[in-house]
Amino acid sequence: MSNDFKIKLGKLLNHWIEHNREHSREFSEWAQKASQHGEKTASREMLRAAGEMERASTSLSQALASLEKGEP
């Protein structure tokens, strides 16, 4: 893998990780608001989506770690 590609991929992974975490936080905040307004099902699904975003961030973090270690 070329060094330029590795640098770009690392930057993209970092960006996606942070972007997902921001969305997860926002989903959780709005889920709480939805719950307070009686929207229990919507709130539950939003919290589920927040968890899925966190799992995606974990996978992306693992990808970044393998890239930084030079694993094929």
List each model region and its residues:
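Residues at alpha-helix boundaries and short interhelical turns
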Residues: I17, R21, E54-S57, E71
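N-terminal acidic leader/helix
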Residues: M1-W30
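Short, charge-rich amphipathic interface segments used for partner binding and complex assembly
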Residues: W30-S66
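Short, charged, intrinsically disordered terminal tails
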Residues: D4-F5, A65-P72
